[in-house]
């Protein structure tokens, strides 16, 4: 950090800044927000997030990355990404996998990640189903990293550890007939010895989802705020947003101050980078609407109009077309409705359909 005085901005300025930073103007086919990957939850939704920015999934690889969730990343990045996501120390490693089912095993810290990554490498030498890999890896790691599953009548490795260690095991995450298939990445790399590049990830979060607090960045990484203190970047400016403070790279201050009004209408899938910000009350102040959008299971996508989330949407395939149902939080203007027709067609094309049917509720 430096001595630059704190600046005060409005919520609207922050949202305009994020919309501009994340490439919703479709000015580039390689949006910078790919530095954070694009979460592919539910499966197949990440290409919709990319299309909202004028990009495609060409040249991208699907891996388990942040918090063990499936993300699309540039195919050239897995080795560097693995080094950046490798826990900073034992305490950080324990925080990332701490769960009731492996309370003692989590205390192994970095060793838990290393032994699991090595088990992945010995197991995944060809495409295998996730269940088959889980069985083999579970048998190869210390018992303290597994738990008894009564319905299965077997011990399973903690899912939180399993998916976070997959990238370190140089594993690609695919799908075949609706089932997860794991296979070796095309360009294998060694298990990281130490973390490297974590500070760049922190800076990327602050650039695309800032201003943000240390706690918000830590939550995105799946760890505790104290863990990332050693990699908290220099060159940040404190920003007060309607009284709440966060941090932004000094290089982005002018972009924040001069962020233009956003006019685009976009359909964002549930895992869209814009929705990954941990300050949900800033994105959507109404608590009831927050609950409607960010559901633990089966949540809808978000309708972005300008810089505001104005509703939710869902899509389902019906023959050779896709039916897109939009539910506005309030009445949608005629211009937004017209734009939604185009965006619904974009969703249909991404999903391989020829036609879109838009319903607005």
Stretches found by the model and what they are:
Residues 1-147:
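Phosphate-backbone binding and catalysis cores of DNA-processing enzymes
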Residues 58-65, 167-175, 236-241, 311:
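A short, conserved structural fragment
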Residues 132-138, 214-218, 307:
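A short acidic, leucine-rich amphipathic alpha-helix
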Residues 151-230:
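Loop-centered beta-sheet repeat module
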Residues 287, 292-361:
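Glycine-rich, small/acidic residue-mixed loop/short-helix segments
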């Amino acid at each position: 950090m430096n001595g630059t005085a704190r600046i005060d901005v409005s919520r609207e300025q922050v949202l305009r800044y994020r919309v501009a930073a994340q490439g919703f103007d479709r000015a580039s086919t390689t949006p910078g927000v790919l530095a954070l990957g694009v979460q592919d939850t539910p499966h197949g939704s990440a290409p919709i997030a990319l299309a909202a920015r004028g990009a495609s999934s060409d040249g991208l690889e699907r891996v388990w990355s942040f918090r063990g969730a499936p993300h699309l990343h540039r195919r050239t990045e897995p080795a560097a990404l693995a080094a950046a996501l490798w826990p900073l120390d034992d305490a950080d490693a324990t925080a990332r996998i701490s769960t009731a089912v492996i309370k003692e095993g989590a205390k192994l810290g970095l060793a838990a990640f290393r032994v699991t990554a090595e088990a992945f490498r010995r197991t995944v030498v060809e495409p295998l189903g996730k269940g088959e890999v889980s069985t083999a890896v579970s048998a190869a790691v210390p018992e303290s990293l597994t738990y008894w599953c009564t319905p299965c009548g077997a011990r399973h490795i903690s899912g939180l550890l399993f998916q976070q260690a997959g990238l370190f095991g140089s594993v690609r995450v695919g799908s075949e007939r609706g089932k997860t298939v794991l296979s070796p990445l095309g360009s294998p790399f060694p298990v990281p010895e130490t973390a490297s590049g974590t500070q760049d990830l922190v800076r990327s979060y602050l650039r695309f989802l800032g201003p943000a607090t240390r706690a918000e960045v830590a939550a995105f990484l799946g760890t505790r705020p104290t863990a990332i203190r050693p990699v908290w970047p220099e060159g940040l400016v404190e920003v007060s947003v309607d009284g709440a403070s966060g941090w932004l790279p000094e290089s982005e201050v002018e972009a924040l101050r001069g962020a233009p009004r956003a006019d685009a209408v976009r359909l964002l899938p549930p895992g869209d980078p814009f929705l990954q910000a941990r300050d949900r009350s800033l994105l959507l102040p109404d608590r009831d609407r927050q609950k409607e959008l960010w559901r633990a299971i089966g949540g809808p996508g978000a309708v972005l109009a300008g810089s505001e989330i104005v509703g939710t949407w869902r899509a389902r395939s019906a023959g050779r077309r896709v039916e897109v149902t939009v539910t506005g939080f309030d009445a949608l203007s005629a211009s937004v409705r017209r734009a939604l027709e185009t965006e619904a067609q974009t969703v249909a094309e991404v999903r391989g359909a020829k036609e879109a049917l838009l319903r607005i509720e």
